[in-house]
């Protein structure tokens, strides 16, 4: 599967998962600013959830969540801070999650949701 198509598949799968399985209200998908991008911004009813989606077809490169290294966490934190500032949401509790997606053998995708996957990164 092409990298762009694989990423799209993963994000759409994660989006359906957070809406249907988790019952989250999705505020934004692929939120971009000059600092970077966040795949999904959702509200679980109490907390704003900034979600990074990682999709893999094989385990050759390790677990998908391992791709969310320090540099990526720092970038996500900066984009989230800018989002909170732009919409005046500083008072809202927030967390950073990772959703791993992989194509399943039976046509059903494999999904692993890692809530509180990391803390906000500073410099």
Predicted regions and their residues:
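Mg2+/Mn2+-dependent nuclease catalytic core
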Residues: 57-82
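Residue-level signal for inorganic ion chemistry
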Residues: 18, 76, 96
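Short beta-strand or tight-loop elements
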Residues: 22, 34-38, 94
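Protein kinase-like catalytic core scaffold
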Residues: 36, 47-49, 97, 112
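Acidic-basic catalytic patches of nuclease active cores, encompassing PD-(D/E)XK
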Residues: 1-29
């Amino acid at each position: 599967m092409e990298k762009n198509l694989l990423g799209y598949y993963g994000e759409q799968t994660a989006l359906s998962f957070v809406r249907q399985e988790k019952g989250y209200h999705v505020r934004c998908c692929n939120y971009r600013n000059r600092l970077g991008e966040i795949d999904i911004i959702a509200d679980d009813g109490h907390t704003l959830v900034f979600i990074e989606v990682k999709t893999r077809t094989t385990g050759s490169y390790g677990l998908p969540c391992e791709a969310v290294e320090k540099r990526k966490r720092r970038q996500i934190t900066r984009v989230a801070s800018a989002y909170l500032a732009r919409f005046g949401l500083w008072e809202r509790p927030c967390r950073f999650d990772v959703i791993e997606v992989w194509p399943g053998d039976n046509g059903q995708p494999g999904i692993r949701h890692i809530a509180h996957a990391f803390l906000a990164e500073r410099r």
